Amino acid sequence: EVQFGVLGHLSLGFDSTNNKIISAFANVSDNNHGYAIVGTVSGTSMSFGSSAKFEAENTRFTDIAHDTDTGKTVIVYTDQGNSSYGTAVVSTVSGTSISFGTPVVYESANSAINSVVYDTNSNKMVIAYYDGGNSSYGTAIVGTVSGTGISFGTAVVFNSAITPTLSITFDSSISKIIIAYQDDGNSDKGTFVIGTVSGTSISFGSEIIFHNAATNQPKAVFDSSANKVVISYKDDGDGNKGKSVVVQLESEARGQVASGSSASVDIIGTVSTNQDG
Protein backbone atom coordinates (compact mmCIF):
# COMPACT_ATOMS: atom_id res chain seq x y z
CA GLU A 1 0.00 0.00 0.00
CA VAL A 2 1.29 3.43 -0.99
CA GLN A 3 -0.25 6.64 0.32
CA PHE A 4 0.05 10.03 -1.36
CA GLY A 5 -2.33 12.27 0.57
CA VAL A 6 -5.84 12.87 1.85
CA LEU A 7 -7.99 13.21 -1.23
CA GLY A 8 -11.39 13.12 -2.90
CA HIS A 9 -12.82 12.77 -6.41
CA LEU A 10 -10.02 10.42 -7.40
CA SER A 11 -9.55 9.19 -10.96
CA LEU A 12 -6.87 7.00 -12.54
CA GLY A 13 -5.53 6.75 -16.06
CA PHE A 14 -2.72 4.97 -17.90
CA ASP A 15 -0.15 6.89 -19.93
CA SER A 16 0.84 4.31 -22.54
CA THR A 17 3.43 6.66 -24.04
CA ASN A 18 5.48 6.72 -20.83
CA ASN A 19 4.13 3.54 -19.20
CA LYS A 20 2.99 5.48 -16.15
CA ILE A 21 -0.12 5.64 -14.00
CA ILE A 22 -1.61 9.10 -13.53
CA SER A 23 -3.94 9.94 -10.68
CA ALA A 24 -5.97 13.15 -10.52
CA PHE A 25 -7.70 14.16 -7.32
CA ALA A 26 -9.01 16.90 -5.09
CA ASN A 27 -6.43 17.48 -2.36
CA VAL A 28 -8.40 17.72 0.87
CA SER A 29 -5.29 19.04 2.65
CA ASP A 30 -5.20 22.02 0.23
CA ASN A 31 -8.80 23.25 0.08
CA ASN A 32 -9.78 20.53 -2.43
CA HIS A 33 -7.58 22.03 -5.13
CA GLY A 34 -6.92 19.84 -8.16
CA TYR A 35 -3.70 17.81 -8.14
CA ALA A 36 -2.17 15.01 -10.17
CA ILE A 37 0.63 12.56 -9.47
CA VAL A 38 2.62 10.06 -11.54
CA GLY A 39 2.97 6.44 -10.44
CA THR A 40 5.42 3.78 -11.59
CA VAL A 41 4.67 0.07 -11.30
CA SER A 42 7.60 -2.29 -10.76
CA GLY A 43 6.76 -5.94 -10.15
CA THR A 44 4.17 -5.95 -7.38
CA SER A 45 5.15 -2.56 -5.99
CA MET A 46 4.37 1.01 -6.94
CA SER A 47 6.12 4.32 -6.34
CA PHE A 48 5.07 7.91 -6.90
CA GLY A 49 6.71 11.18 -7.84
CA SER A 50 5.71 14.52 -6.36
CA SER A 51 2.15 15.73 -6.81
CA ALA A 52 1.55 18.89 -8.85
CA LYS A 53 -1.38 21.30 -8.84
CA PHE A 54 -3.44 21.79 -12.01
CA GLU A 55 -6.34 23.78 -10.49
CA ALA A 56 -6.14 26.30 -7.63
CA GLU A 57 -9.86 26.01 -6.84
CA ASN A 58 -12.24 23.41 -5.45
CA THR A 59 -12.15 20.50 -7.92
CA ARG A 60 -14.75 17.76 -8.39
CA PHE A 61 -15.69 14.94 -10.78
CA THR A 62 -12.25 14.32 -12.26
CA ASP A 63 -11.57 11.85 -15.06
CA ILE A 64 -8.53 11.04 -17.22
CA ALA A 65 -7.79 9.83 -20.75
CA HIS A 66 -4.51 9.48 -22.65
CA ASP A 67 -3.99 10.75 -26.19
CA THR A 68 -1.73 8.19 -27.87
CA ASP A 69 -1.25 10.42 -30.92
CA THR A 70 0.24 13.38 -29.05
CA GLY A 71 1.49 11.51 -25.98
CA LYS A 72 -0.48 13.86 -23.73
CA THR A 73 -2.99 13.06 -21.00
CA VAL A 74 -6.18 15.08 -20.53
CA ILE A 75 -7.78 15.65 -17.14
CA VAL A 76 -11.41 16.78 -17.09
CA TYR A 77 -13.12 18.15 -13.99
CA THR A 78 -15.70 20.48 -12.51
CA ASP A 79 -14.17 23.79 -11.44
CA GLN A 80 -16.24 24.92 -8.48
CA GLY A 81 -14.21 28.10 -8.24
CA ASN A 82 -15.48 29.06 -11.70
CA SER A 83 -19.23 28.51 -11.37
CA SER A 84 -18.74 24.71 -11.59
CA TYR A 85 -17.87 24.94 -15.27
CA GLY A 86 -16.70 21.83 -17.08
CA THR A 87 -12.96 22.22 -17.60
CA ALA A 88 -10.10 20.29 -19.19
CA VAL A 89 -6.33 20.55 -18.86
CA VAL A 90 -3.58 18.87 -20.90
CA SER A 91 -0.75 17.28 -18.94
CA THR A 92 2.77 16.25 -19.91
CA VAL A 93 4.70 13.50 -18.13
CA SER A 94 8.48 13.56 -17.89
CA GLY A 95 9.96 10.81 -15.77
CA THR A 96 7.98 10.92 -12.53
CA SER A 97 7.01 14.58 -12.92
CA ILE A 98 3.87 16.06 -14.45
CA SER A 99 3.21 19.55 -15.80
CA PHE A 100 0.13 21.24 -17.23
CA GLY A 101 -1.05 23.61 -19.91
CA THR A 102 -3.70 26.25 -19.32
CA PRO A 103 -7.13 24.90 -18.28
CA VAL A 104 -9.83 25.28 -20.94
CA VAL A 105 -13.58 25.48 -20.30
CA TYR A 106 -15.65 23.09 -22.43
CA GLU A 107 -19.02 23.79 -20.76
CA SER A 108 -19.83 27.29 -19.48
CA ALA A 109 -22.46 26.01 -17.07
CA ASN A 110 -22.70 23.68 -14.10
CA SER A 111 -21.12 20.44 -15.30
CA ALA A 112 -20.91 17.19 -13.37
CA ILE A 113 -20.25 13.44 -13.75
CA ASN A 114 -17.52 14.21 -16.30
CA SER A 115 -16.31 11.13 -18.20
CA VAL A 116 -13.65 11.22 -20.94
CA VAL A 117 -12.27 8.73 -23.46
CA TYR A 118 -9.80 8.88 -26.35
CA ASP A 119 -11.09 7.90 -29.78
CA THR A 120 -8.12 6.26 -31.52
CA ASN A 121 -9.89 6.29 -34.89
CA SER A 122 -10.37 10.06 -35.05
CA ASN A 123 -7.54 10.99 -32.64
CA LYS A 124 -10.01 13.00 -30.58
CA MET A 125 -11.03 13.25 -26.95
CA VAL A 126 -14.73 12.81 -26.24
CA ILE A 127 -16.22 14.06 -22.98
CA ALA A 128 -19.67 13.07 -21.71
CA TYR A 129 -21.24 14.98 -18.85
CA TYR A 130 -24.38 16.13 -17.06
CA ASP A 131 -25.16 19.65 -18.28
CA GLY A 132 -26.73 21.58 -15.43
CA GLY A 133 -27.12 24.59 -17.71
CA ASN A 134 -29.42 22.67 -20.07
CA SER A 135 -31.98 20.90 -17.88
CA SER A 136 -29.32 18.40 -16.69
CA TYR A 137 -29.36 16.67 -20.08
CA GLY A 138 -26.72 14.13 -21.00
CA THR A 139 -24.27 15.91 -23.29
CA ALA A 140 -21.06 15.14 -25.18
CA ILE A 141 -18.35 17.22 -26.81
CA VAL A 142 -15.29 16.47 -28.97
CA GLY A 143 -11.87 17.85 -28.06
CA THR A 144 -8.65 18.17 -30.08
CA VAL A 145 -5.29 18.19 -28.30
CA SER A 146 -2.57 20.40 -29.78
CA GLY A 147 0.65 20.97 -27.88
CA THR A 148 -0.29 21.70 -24.28
CA GLY A 149 -3.76 22.98 -25.18
CA ILE A 150 -7.12 21.56 -26.17
CA SER A 151 -9.94 23.00 -28.29
CA PHE A 152 -13.54 21.89 -28.57
CA GLY A 153 -16.32 21.52 -31.11
CA THR A 154 -20.00 22.10 -30.36
CA ALA A 155 -21.69 20.19 -27.54
CA VAL A 156 -24.36 17.65 -28.55
CA VAL A 157 -27.19 16.28 -26.39
CA PHE A 158 -27.41 12.49 -26.36
CA ASN A 159 -30.20 12.22 -23.78
CA SER A 160 -32.91 14.89 -23.56
CA ALA A 161 -33.70 14.12 -19.94
CA ILE A 162 -31.94 14.33 -16.59
CA THR A 163 -28.89 12.08 -16.74
CA PRO A 164 -27.75 11.60 -13.13
CA THR A 165 -24.93 9.10 -13.79
CA LEU A 166 -23.00 8.10 -16.91
CA SER A 167 -19.82 6.55 -18.28
CA ILE A 168 -18.07 6.66 -21.65
CA THR A 169 -15.87 4.16 -23.48
CA PHE A 170 -14.51 3.61 -27.00
CA ASP A 171 -15.09 0.38 -28.93
CA SER A 172 -11.99 0.19 -31.14
CA SER A 173 -13.30 -2.87 -33.03
CA ILE A 174 -15.97 -0.70 -34.71
CA SER A 175 -14.50 2.77 -34.01
CA LYS A 176 -17.54 3.94 -32.04
CA ILE A 177 -18.13 5.82 -28.81
CA ILE A 178 -20.40 4.13 -26.25
CA ILE A 179 -22.07 6.15 -23.48
CA ALA A 180 -23.92 4.21 -20.77
CA TYR A 181 -26.21 6.20 -18.53
CA GLN A 182 -29.08 6.32 -16.08
CA ASP A 183 -32.11 7.76 -17.91
CA ASP A 184 -34.23 9.74 -15.46
CA GLY A 185 -36.68 10.42 -18.29
CA ASN A 186 -37.40 6.70 -18.63
CA SER A 187 -37.74 5.44 -15.05
CA ASP A 188 -33.94 5.46 -14.54
CA LYS A 189 -33.52 2.50 -16.89
CA GLY A 190 -29.99 1.51 -17.85
CA THR A 191 -29.40 2.84 -21.34
CA PHE A 192 -26.61 3.39 -23.83
CA VAL A 193 -26.09 5.20 -27.11
CA ILE A 194 -23.59 4.70 -29.92
CA GLY A 195 -21.69 7.77 -31.06
CA THR A 196 -19.71 8.50 -34.22
CA VAL A 197 -17.02 11.18 -34.30
CA SER A 198 -16.48 13.13 -37.51
CA GLY A 199 -14.04 16.01 -37.33
CA THR A 200 -14.95 18.00 -34.23
CA SER A 201 -18.56 16.77 -34.22
CA ILE A 202 -20.29 13.72 -32.77
CA SER A 203 -23.65 12.18 -33.71
CA PHE A 204 -25.66 9.50 -31.96
CA GLY A 205 -27.99 6.68 -32.87
CA SER A 206 -31.16 5.81 -30.97
CA GLU A 207 -30.93 4.86 -27.32
CA ILE A 208 -30.68 1.17 -26.43
CA ILE A 209 -31.81 -0.21 -23.06
CA PHE A 210 -29.41 -2.65 -21.42
CA HIS A 211 -31.31 -3.01 -18.13
CA ASN A 212 -35.10 -2.62 -18.15
CA ALA A 213 -35.36 -1.40 -14.55
CA ALA A 214 -33.99 1.32 -12.30
CA THR A 215 -30.22 1.47 -12.76
CA ASN A 216 -27.56 3.54 -11.03
CA GLN A 217 -23.89 4.37 -11.58
CA PRO A 218 -23.21 2.50 -14.83
CA LYS A 219 -19.55 2.03 -15.76
CA ALA A 220 -18.65 1.03 -19.31
CA VAL A 221 -15.36 -0.50 -20.47
CA PHE A 222 -14.21 -2.07 -23.74
CA ASP A 223 -12.54 -5.49 -23.68
CA SER A 224 -10.14 -5.36 -26.63
CA SER A 225 -9.40 -9.09 -26.45
CA ALA A 226 -13.05 -10.14 -26.72
CA ASN A 227 -14.16 -7.08 -28.74
CA LYS A 228 -17.08 -6.55 -26.39
CA VAL A 229 -18.28 -3.77 -24.14
CA VAL A 230 -18.98 -4.57 -20.48
CA ILE A 231 -21.31 -2.33 -18.50
CA SER A 232 -21.37 -2.71 -14.72
CA TYR A 233 -24.10 -1.06 -12.69
CA LYS A 234 -26.06 -0.99 -9.46
CA ASP A 235 -29.47 -2.65 -9.86
CA ASP A 236 -31.79 -0.46 -7.80
CA GLY A 237 -34.64 -2.90 -8.37
CA ASP A 238 -32.76 -5.87 -6.92
CA GLY A 239 -31.45 -4.75 -3.57
CA ASN A 240 -28.78 -2.48 -5.05
CA LYS A 241 -26.75 -5.48 -6.17
CA GLY A 242 -23.80 -4.89 -8.43
CA LYS A 243 -24.32 -6.47 -11.86
CA SER A 244 -22.66 -6.51 -15.26
CA VAL A 245 -23.89 -6.96 -18.80
CA VAL A 246 -21.83 -7.92 -21.86
CA VAL A 247 -22.70 -6.07 -25.07
CA GLN A 248 -21.54 -6.91 -28.57
CA LEU A 249 -22.34 -4.45 -31.32
CA GLU A 250 -23.42 -6.31 -34.45
CA SER A 251 -22.67 -5.62 -38.11
CA GLU A 252 -25.18 -2.79 -38.50
CA ALA A 253 -23.19 -0.70 -36.02
CA ARG A 254 -19.97 -1.14 -37.99
CA GLY A 255 -21.10 1.37 -40.61
CA GLN A 256 -21.92 4.99 -40.02
CA VAL A 257 -24.58 5.46 -37.35
CA ALA A 258 -26.42 8.65 -38.16
CA SER A 259 -28.23 10.72 -35.58
CA GLY A 260 -31.67 9.24 -34.97
CA SER A 261 -30.91 5.87 -36.55
CA SER A 262 -30.63 2.57 -34.73
CA ALA A 263 -28.00 -0.15 -34.55
CA SER A 264 -28.40 -3.80 -33.61
CA VAL A 265 -26.73 -5.12 -30.51
CA ASP A 266 -26.45 -8.44 -28.79
CA ILE A 267 -27.02 -8.27 -25.04
CA ILE A 268 -25.18 -11.47 -24.23
CA GLY A 269 -26.03 -11.77 -20.56
CA THR A 270 -25.76 -10.41 -17.06
CA VAL A 271 -23.75 -11.51 -14.08
CA SER A 272 -24.79 -10.62 -10.55
CA THR A 273 -21.90 -10.03 -8.21
CA ASN A 274 -24.24 -10.44 -5.23
CA GLN A 275 -22.79 -7.31 -3.69
CA ASP A 276 -25.21 -5.11 -1.81
CA GLY A 277 -24.83 -1.37 -2.40
Where are these regions (language model features)?
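Extracellular, repeat-based ectodomains that mediate carbohydrate processing or recognition
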Residues: 1-277
